[in-house]
């Protein structure tokens, strides 16, 4: 059995790879491992709007109850809400049934520990080992020792909305905002939060039917929202993904504003408020060099991690940083939540637009995005480190870096899943970096022939 857990829990095509049987086993093993020692453990369960959610929830909950834990089912709710509410309700763990931005046929199961953090690799491995060993050593409970399922009646959604609203001071009166809910988990929470804060709210893609989640909508397909914002003269647009742990924005001119710009704007604002700990933001190696240049001008440091919000969070926790995130719109505000939170991000941005009295596009001028080129070089899995060993390749990378002279960069990343090495170049001249990236990729391919 290969590793069951990916970078974001267990994912697969529902009923084919992620079966009801596997969901039952994950519920049973997860509840047992995460609640050892608790008298009558409590586990919070939420999901996004996918049709397969009901099937997987039933199986997952059966597994949880079989080891004597209580399952508190809160229904459709954003992933970051489960992270927050697990802490608020003093639950022993939280579980979300969601495949985030993936198409409807996929689903996933993701655990949070009692502090609202995603599980460490070690805990995930313990859960997998227990399943592999066919639950050896896990007692079979009967009678009064079996757990109960508790259906929650809407209080969880209310608590999460109140929490999200509390992350900004004042209101959003006078702001005209368009929201794209991706027919996903934020279709109630984001709309209510913005309305209750006094914004004029326009909404698209907030009628989930079980199969339209992420379909030509949300943060992975923001084209309709870009058009809508301009047509309806909105001050800004905000696009969530299926489980609302990420958010991208649209300025009043219809331009897409990615996570790099959001980090730049929010980082500057936090610094102004004296809340940017150690004057540092945490980003990944894929963040545009334009962000580094912009932050240098603001006297803000950027620390880079591997790609993946879990690595961003790891770095933030290690050094107590206040904000970090990815281009994709996964933004973590450690003062507020333990994971990327689309609604919290959206509210921070909207609040800055209102408070600063500038248009959103003016705020975005803080940063100039450098052209970026990504070329894949086909390389056998056992030779993916050739760019670190071969002298000619190393020399070519050094030459390109020298010629870019601080206004560009070369980044080589082996793919974690395919026989590829990704060659990424950034610089001021699109044509030039395009040529350089292709010739470097070709050199790498020729070396492994």
From Swiss-Prot:
It catalyses: alpha-D-glucosamine 1-phosphate = D-glucosamine 6-phosphate. Activated by phosphorylation. Keywords: Isomerase, Magnesium, Metal-binding, Phosphoprotein. InterPro entries: A-D-PHexomutase_a/b/a-I, A-D-PHexomutase_a/b/a-I/II/III, A-D-PHexomutase_a/b/a-II, A-D-PHexomutase_a/b/a-III, A-D-PHexomutase_C, A-D-PHexomutase_C_sf, A-D-PHexomutase_CS, Alpha-D-phosphohexomutase_SF. The active site is at residue 100. CDD domains: GlmM. The modification Phosphoserine is found at residue 100. GO terms for biological process: carbohydrate metabolic process; peptidoglycan biosynthetic process; UDP-N-acetylglucosamine biosynthetic process. Its EC number is 5.4.2.10. Mg(2+) binds at residues 100, 241, 243, 245. Pfam families: PGM_PMM_I, PGM_PMM_II, PGM_PMM_III, PGM_PMM_IV. Its cofactor is Mg(2+). It is an enzyme of class 5 (isomerase). GO terms for molecular function: magnesium ion binding; phosphoglucosamine mutase activity; phosphomannomutase activity. Coiled coil: none annotated. Binds 1 Mg(2+) ion per subunit. GO terms for cellular component: cytosol. Catalyzes the conversion of glucosamine-6-phosphate to glucosamine-1-phosphate. PANTHER family: PHOSPHOGLUCOMUTASE (ALPHA-D-GLUCOSE-1,6-BISPHOSPHATE-DEPENDENT), PHOSPHOHEXOSE MUTASE. Belongs to the phosphohexose mutase family. This is Phosphoglucosamine mutase. It comes from Clostridium botulinum (strain 657 / Type Ba4). The gene is glmM.
